[in-house]
Every structure is written in structure tokens, then in C-alpha cells.
Amino acid sequence: MIDFDGYRPNVGIVICNKQGQVLWAKRFGQNSWQFPQGGINEGENIEQAMYRELYEEVGLAKKDVRLLWASKYWLRYKLPKRLVRNEQTQPVCIGQKQRWFLLQLVADEGAINLKTSKTPEFDGWRWVSFWYPVRQVVSFKRDVYRKVMKEFAQVLMGEQKKVESEKNRDNKEFTHERKEFRTQPKRELRKPYRVFKGKK
């Protein structure tokens, strides 16, 4: 399915763990790494496409993750000319337009399975620091990755603040019940990522 401008509608998926690292996947038979992504089928809405791709590419079901955020706008990248296929029987696809989702893995990482499809997209994966993919992805996707990660960084910062607030609340409640204990000093949580200072 290609739109009138030549872009294929697509979903992209960033999966994080509780330490703020993100899942980085190696494309099958290649020395190329990226986030899971895939096209939207006719009749699917964006969220349905995301959960289908999530299972097909990394073997995770809806129950294995928590949806933290979905980007509100389409982000586009053009393919290099060498990758554009000029097939007379089909419209020419010049690139992808993507909606991105931020998910947190709530299941054990053993649930990740790259072999759920007969034609696997990936043959390896690992956890990497939050900003690592922006520097390492192929150049024509870099601007999209930078925009996505800047948006998602704000979401994860908010999640960390919630965790810190809940810990402080629990400490205060415990101290109130047992007055011989003092409230634990507030500790600054170690940030799982650094602020990217590259070009916008």
C-alpha cells in the first residue's frame, strides 16, 4: 500500500526495558541494525499493525508489553535511489511514512523470539543505551530516529519521575507507621540516557 506521494505507510516500534535501554535488532543475514518496523496492511488501523509487527518480528504479544506512547504525526524518510524499485506493475515507492510506538517490556526477556515468521526479519538483538540507535542507524533513517527519540525521551523522563515519586511516598508511609525509622533520603535516580545535543 503506497500513498499518492510514493510513501509506504509503516509503523515503527521502540521497546524499552525498566533500565531505560532499548531493543536493537540485527537484520537477517546483514550487518545492519534497526528498530522493528513494518507496513500497514489494508483494513488495519495503526495500532493493530503495530501489534501484528511486534509479534511477527520479535515474537511479543500485547500482554508482554505496556504501551507508553504513540507519536501523533507521520514521519517520513526517502530511500536512496539505489533502493528505489521501478516496477511497472506497481506504484513506485520512494520511501516510508511512519507512526512510532514506545513500548515497555513487562514480560521476561526470554519471551523475545525472532523465529515466529517463516521469513524472519532479524537474526539477533541486544539491549543498547537510549541514544545509541540515533548514531548507529543507516544515514537515511537518522533524522527520523532523532525526532522519535527526542519525543520518547520526554516520556521516559516522566516515567522515571513517577517511579521516584512512588518510592518516596512508600518511604514516608513506612516512616509514619514506624516512627523510630527516619524517612529515607531522596536519591537521584541514575538517568538511563543522556540528552542528545545534535542538530534538530
From Swiss-Prot:
Motif (Nudix box): 38-59
Gene Ontology terms, MF aspect: mRNA 5'-diphosphatase activity
PROSITE patterns documented for this protein: NUDIX (PS51462), NUDIX_BOX (PS00893)
Keyword Hydrolase found: yes
Segments passing through the bilayer: none
InterPro entries: Nudix_hydrolase, NUDIX_hydrolase-like_dom_sf, NUDIX_hydrolase_CS, NUDIX_hydrolase_dom, RppH
EC number: 3.6.1.-
Residue stretches making up the Nudix hydrolase domain: 6-150
Biological process according to GO: mRNA catabolic process
Region (Disordered) residue spans: 161-188
Any Gene Ontology CC annotation: cytoplasm
Cofactor needs: a divalent metal cation
Family: Belongs to the Nudix hydrolase family. RppH subfamily.
Protein name: RNA pyrophosphohydrolase
Organism: Glaesserella parasuis serovar 5 (strain SH0165)
